[in-house]
A protein has these predicted regions:
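Signature of multi-pass transmembrane helix bundles
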Residues: 1-166
Length: 166
């Protein structure tokens, strides 16, 4: 469910930008082009939220659990930065960390539902956010390094491909 949900979220959040950005580059800047660019960029940044909702749905969780997962995934994804009292939303986050955080958030949400009973309405969002989002924030630097290393390997393989095929 975690892999399928994240794969679907990647398709929903990232494919529109991949399709439209190529077309927008060839167009003259005007209000419509600027609005389209803003919409697809915002869709990319919504990847952590979409991932949490797709994974939560595939795990057959309720709205409270799924929304709590979305909070935790947004917090742990790396899509937001906080500097000088201001939050900045940029990019789609670290996809590996989005996947890890959705998995942890799903487990925490399922556990909290069983343990908290009627108190879950009050405490579940906080527990899922603090535990799963906190784990996401702690693993973020390591996942950034892993993602960068994978990117370097892919870039090297892409650069070497003409030589190998030569």
């Amino acid at each position: 469910a975690v892999l399928n949900g994240n794969a679907l979220a990647i398709m929903v959040a990232l494919v529109p930008a991949a399709l439209v950005n190529q077309l927008l580059g060839a167009m003259t800047l005007n209000g419509v082009v600027t609005s389209l660019a803003m919409m697809v960029t915002l869709a990319q940044s919504a990847l952590p939220l979409i991932a949490a909702f797709t994974v939560g749905t595939m795990l057959k969780l309720g709205m409270m659990e799924t929304a709590s997962m979305a909070l935790a995934t947004l917090a742990g994804s790396g899509v937001t930065t906080f500097k000088d009292g201001t939050f900045t939303l940029a990019g789609s986050g670290v996809i590996l960390n989005v996947m890890l955080t959705t998995a942890v958030a799903g487990l925490v949400a399922m556990g909290a539902t069983k343990v908290l009973g009627q108190l879950r309405v009050v405490f579940e969002p906080l527990i899922v956010l603090v535990v799963a989002g906190g784990i996401g924030l702690m693993t973020l630097p390591g996942m950034v390094a892993v993602q960068a290393a994978v990117g370097q390997v892919v870039a090297s393989a892409t650069a070497a491909a003409p030589l190998v095929m030569g």
